[in-house]
């Protein structure tokens, strides 16, 4: 396979015939958040809400959100594909269909979805399709997965507002996929809160420099 063919393959979602089979049992992961000590898989306090963000390599994306006041816990994992309970190595092949994502569990009385969305839009480049900077492939695509129709509508409205802001600077279009949440599979313990365990580790987050115009009032 030529370099061009290999590159093109990495930028395409796999067919059902190509996807890896995965497994029935979940991949073992940490029980508690390395930074906060809160449970990664719950139970969480009443009133918490959830959203999944994909914005390239999940190491830097997770750190971005665990630092936000009102975020109760974060976890990295895989979503949006077909392979059940994939490993990191399988996901990196591009043959699971999954994106690297961050689960953000937050208290809406302290931080709003709009505030989280503003961080999402400003801290990566949502116009790059199946890549994020030097990280190339469907695994690194930009996604927002919500857990109800109301939150999906909020996310779509934020996308439209940010698209206009980008267009005013000659950038775009936005390629971020927004849907209600598919199955989420927790990544291995090694990847959870990676940049807290490895402060000098890789972080590929790079924004466009365009501010998000979303109203941030509660």
Swiss-Prot record:
Enzyme class: oxidoreductase
Statement: the UniProt record of this protein carries the keyword Transferase: no
Reactions catalysed according to its record: L-methionyl-[protein] + [thioredoxin]-disulfide + H2O = L-methionyl-(S)-S-oxide-[protein] + [thioredoxin]-dithiol; [thioredoxin]-disulfide + L-methionine + H2O = L-methionine (S)-S-oxide + [thioredoxin]-dithiol
Active-site residues (renumbered): 57
GO molecular-function terms, A-Z: L-methionine-(S)-S-oxide reductase activity; peptide-methionine (S)-S-oxide reductase activity
Record key words, sorted: Oxidoreductase
Any one Gene Ontology BP term: cellular response to oxidative stress
Coiled-coil annotated residue ranges, if any: none
One Gene Ontology cellular component: cytoplasm
EC number, UniProt record: 1.8.4.11
Annotated NCBIfam families: msrA
Function: Has an important function as a repair enzyme for proteins that have been inactivated by oxidation. Catalyzes the reversible oxidation-reduction of methionine sulfoxide in proteins to methionine.
The family this protein is said to belong to: Belongs to the MsrA Met sulfoxide reductase family.
PANTHER family: MITOCHONDRIAL PEPTIDE METHIONINE SULFOXIDE REDUCTASE
Protein name: Peptide methionine sulfoxide reductase MsrA
Gene name of the encoded protein: msrA
